[in-house]
């Protein structure tokens, strides 16, 4: 979750103010630092793809890297001489508030994995620190048996990723022997730990690994109808009932108030995750 000011939240409720301003602080492999803004970043090219489950399915224990993509304006060959491969990026987005100031939000730390040069433009595909776990687990020197908590902590230490979640469900569960496979990576280990904990694994905007799950309490904030479950009764016995009324008197039937559009911020979380 990204904390923002009340003013930022208020601006997010205005339909005419969703013009986020991109910022990228790029540190090249040779130490050169480039600070890019909307003047250098191609319009509407700044995109972040995030997920807590595998594509096209619902998974427990997903450890999906967040991808940042943006295009740099290079019409005048300003950046042609720079090597962006492996560069580190601190990405931010800003929003202009009612008082004219700009509030900037840190949306993550990334590493350039696929730079492409097209003469007038340079496109950078970047992954967050979850990508640091993409190396062989055979390098681990951790002594087994080991608890899930110890396994996760050691994986973060070995891969240089700070850990935010130090305690979690089933964290004391002990694994008897070290998993052995030539294809096994630290990312696989992180995913396995998350699955046994009943969580997903993510990198937050500050670059820390955490285990989390979905907040279902938001669905109780308004007078919503519960659809129940596919129980064995016929007709289904669970869930709320609502009378649809009749076509003679359209005012007949049950009503349910789903709240206001402002209430929907809890579902979309547009101002929390960008």
Question: Model segments located where?
Answer:
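C-terminal extracytoplasmic interaction modules
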Residues: 101, 167-189, 195-196, 203-221, ...
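Extracellular beta-strand-rich, repetitive "passenger/adhesive" scaffolds
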Residues: 96-101, 154-159, 234
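Small disulfide-bonded, cysteine-rich extracellular recognition modules and tandem repeats
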Residues: 115, 129, 212-214, 233, ...
């Amino acid at each position: 979750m990204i904390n923002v000011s009340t003013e930022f939240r208020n601006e997010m409720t205005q339909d005419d103010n969703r013009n986020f301003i991109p910022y990228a602080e790029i540190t090249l492999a040779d130490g050169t630092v480039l600070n890019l803004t909307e003047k250098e970043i191609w319009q509407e090219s700044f995109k972040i793809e995030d997920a807590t489950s595998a594509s096209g399915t619902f998974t427990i224990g997903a450890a999906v890297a967040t991808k940042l993509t943006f295009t740099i304006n290079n019409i005048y060959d300003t950046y042609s001489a720079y090597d962006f491969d492996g560069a580190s990026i601190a990405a931010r987005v800003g929003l202009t508030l009612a008082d004219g100031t700009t509030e900037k939000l840190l949306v993550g730390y990334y590493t350039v994995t696929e730079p492409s040069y097209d003469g007038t433009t340079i496109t950078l595909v970047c992954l967050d620190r979850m990508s640091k776990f993409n190396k062989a687990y055979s390098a681990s020197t951790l002594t087994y048996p080991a608890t899930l908590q110890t396994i996760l902590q050691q994986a973060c230490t070995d891969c240089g990723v700070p850990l935010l979640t130090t305690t979690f469900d089933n964290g004391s569960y002990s694994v008897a022997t070290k998993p052995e496979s030539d294809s096994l990576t630290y990312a696989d280990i992180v995913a396995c730990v998350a699955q046994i904990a009943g969580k997903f694994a993510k990198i937050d905007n500050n670059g820390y690994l955490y285990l989390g799950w979905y907040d279902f309490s938001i669905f109780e904030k308004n007078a919503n109808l519960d659809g129940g479950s596919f129980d064995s009764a016929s007709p289904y016995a669970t869930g709320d009932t609502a009378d649809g009324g009749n076509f003679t008197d359209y005012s007949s039937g049950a009503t349910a108030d789903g709240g206001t559009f402002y209430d929907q911020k809890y579902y979309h979380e547009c101002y929390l995750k960008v």
